[in-house]
């Protein structure tokens, strides 16, 4: 896409929101409580603040304010307000490709924010536990928050990811013509690295005329030992392993497809 010469500030709002899910099997009530305590500490407010602060560094944003809170009995939230940085538009990379991991990308932001909320969850029946992190990066300026996507998914390793990206509003060029998007995008997947794409099965649901893009990701490889909390698969009977595998896989598919699936 040809670079636009704008009249005034770029007024487009670009919002990236995604949920990541971590699934676990905990056999006893004590193990379920232990998993919730473990994941709650792993993604506490301080660590989430570090991740979001690095995200600001990646997109070149100035941090104005940080609000963070750990909740009882579990959960945490962090919201960071960020401001614009003066930047030469010639330095902005508008091409459709994966963003960096720790490297810095210049951004031009205004009235923007980055926030995350966590939701640990378990049920006494079935032994299944889930952890969801809900993240939103919203910017107003010349760069898409998709540049932070690669880093965030690498930091928050997950079994399932659902991603939404939307461009809202319009900006005007020097001739007064309105532009409702200022960069090319065919798929959110184009902003992911090849190693990440190789790990997940992915599907897109895009509404191009509305500048709405959606991608769902489900981890390809399933190894039972990675889903057990304080229990080794070899300590279980073959029947138990099969039943737990079926329960975990059903749980993951239900979350991925967003609907309950009847037992076969």
Swiss-Prot record:
Family annotation (SUPFAM superfamilies): S-adenosylmethionine decarboxylase
Annotated site (Cleavage (non-hydrolytic)): 111-112
Organism of derivation: Salmonella heidelberg (strain SL476)
Family: Belongs to the prokaryotic AdoMetDC family. Type 2 subfamily.
InterPro entries in the cross-refs: AdoMetDC_fam_prok, S-AdoMet_deCO2ase_bac, S-AdoMet_deCO2ase_core
Cofactor note: Binds 1 pyruvoyl group covalently per subunit.
Pfam family, one: AdoMet_dc
Modifications after synthesis and translation: Is synthesized initially as an inactive proenzyme. Formation of the active enzyme involves a self-maturation process in which the active site pyruvoyl group is generated from an internal serine residue via an autocatalytic post-translational modification. Two non-identical subunits are generated from the proenzyme in this reaction, and the pyruvate is formed at the N-terminus of the alpha chain, which is derived from the carboxyl end of the proenzyme.
Sites bearing Pyruvic acid (Ser), chain numbering: 112
A single GO BP: spermidine biosynthetic process
Coiled coil: none
This protein's UniProt keywords: Autocatalytic cleavage, Decarboxylase, Lyase, Polyamine biosynthesis, Pyruvate, S-adenosyl-L-methionine, Schiff base, Spermidine biosynthesis, Zymogen
Superkingdom in the source lineage: Bacteria
Protein's name in the database: S-adenosylmethionine decarboxylase proenzyme
A GO MF label: adenosylmethionine decarboxylase activity
One GO cellular component, as annotated: cytosol
